[in-house]
Amino acid sequence: MSMVIGIGDLLVGYYWQWRDESQVEGKFMFYRAAKKTTPVKYQYTSNLSRCFLVFGIEPKPNKSGNFNNTMPDTEHSGDTTVNQVETIVTTVVVEQQVPTLVALDSLINENLKLASASQSSGWGFAHGLLVGQLSVVAVLAFFIKFFIFGNSSMARPLMVAPLINRKPAGVYKKGRAKSFSEVEDYDSETSSTQILDKTYYDVKTHQSESLDWFNVLVAQSIAQFRYEALNNDNIYHSLSDALSSSNLPDYLDKITITEINIGDDFPIFSNCRIKHSPNNSNRLEAKIDVDVADTLTLGIETQLLLNQPKPFTAVLPVQLSVSIVRFSACLTVSLISTADEEFQSSIKCVEDSENAIGDYEDDDDEFGGGAALMFSFSPDFRLEFEVKSLIGARSKLENVPLIGNLIEEKLKSWFLERCVEPRFQLIELPSMWPRKKNTRKPVDSESETAVDSN
């Protein structure tokens, strides 16, 4: 780098020296460019301290060392041509360090310019070297200031200021006297804002996502569930046990499963977007469109018993087949803390309302203070059924509309009371901390370890 700077300074110095010398050479070229036949008047003055008049014959100084006595005291002029005075350049007069031009012709006098005779070539080189050094220093200072320190100084306050103003509430130091219960409550509003900022997600302008990758994962899970359900008739035995263990009314006989179809298609999730919850603006929730175009069928048969005036007075065989052929809705999913007051109050409200109706299902689910997955469906859902019925022994009634409408309304009412907003379903999530009891390893690795030990 220093070598490049030195070479640059030398070039600048030589430029200034060449510039001083080129002014004199330019005067020679100017004279030679004049017409050869043009008369040229020359004149000189002698009342100056020192005068050089170049006619090809240099004036000689007198004994006192000056040239004044060799020249007349008055102005002289004469006529000649450029050919005769081609060696005549100009008259450079130095008087009190002020340059003076005595030209040979009025036209030349209007166009010629002389540099100061006191300026030497050595001073021109030194001047150029100094200017070169200063210019290089100025360029380096400009580059360092605006290209190295300029951007960092502007971007630093934007990144550091929030870290200075924010309290490290999640930092734990060993040996502290205060317990975690004394730490400030977690600010959900600040958390949601920071999450959106650090993930570069704008809830107002961000485009919805297709969730193709999520559909593949869900399809794999459903395929595994179907395999386990159909293996050794597991789903048949599970449903039969559930129906037989339930308390049936007196007018129903034992229920037998005649048909099971768990489908062969998969749900499609799409148009996923993150929004603020309308009930709590500090909580984020994902809204996903769900569409299921598949056939899920459950067929049963039973008997209606007429026990009056005595038991089993009359028996009416009934066969039903209910299929879900289409379901589409907007699914709302969010992660919440089960210790939130909003969650606890909503649970209590649901329990009170269901206890008043007498339809409360006590599952003995007690949620702690961990995280839970909350989901619900929008009220404008679409749920289509296909109900087939066959009633009677000898004279049979097939597909009675009244029975189909009754069953469809009952199923939709069951779905509304459990999964449709403002009600929701809650799934408690396991702890994210690794535990020894949850650790697993492949069977092959265990066998290889046993072989190596032997």
UniProtKB/Swiss-Prot annotation:
Residues 1-128 are lumenal. Residues 150-454 are cytoplasmic. GO terms for cellular component: endoplasmic reticulum membrane; ERMES complex. This is Maintenance of mitochondrial morphology protein 1. It is a single-pass type I membrane protein. InterPro entries: Mmm1 (IPR027537), MMM1_dom (IPR019411), SMP_LBD (IPR031468). The SMP-LTD domain is a barrel-like domain that can bind various types of glycerophospholipids in its interior and mediate their transfer between two adjacent bilayers. One of its GO terms (molecular function) is lipid binding. Homodimer. Component of the ER-mitochondria encounter structure (ERMES) or MDM complex, composed of MMM1, MDM10, MDM12 and MDM34. A MMM1 homodimer associates with one molecule of MDM12 on each side in a pairwise head-to-tail manner, and the SMP-LTD domains of MMM1 and MDM12 generate a continuous hydrophobic tunnel for phospholipid trafficking. Keywords: Endoplasmic reticulum, Lipid transport, Lipid-binding, Membrane, Transmembrane, Transmembrane helix, Transport. The chain crosses the membrane at residues 129-149. Residues 207-430 form the SMP-LTD domain. It is found in: Endoplasmic reticulum membrane. Component of the ERMES/MDM complex, which serves as a molecular tether to connect the endoplasmic reticulum (ER) and mitochondria. Components of this complex are involved in the control of mitochondrial shape and protein biogenesis, and function in nonvesicular lipid trafficking between the ER and mitochondria. The MDM12-MMM1 subcomplex functions in the major beta-barrel assembly pathway that is responsible for biogenesis of all outer membrane beta-barrel proteins, and acts in a late step after the SAM complex. GO terms for biological process: mitochondrial genome maintenance; mitochondrion-endoplasmic reticulum membrane tethering; phospholipid transport; protein insertion into mitochondrial outer membrane.
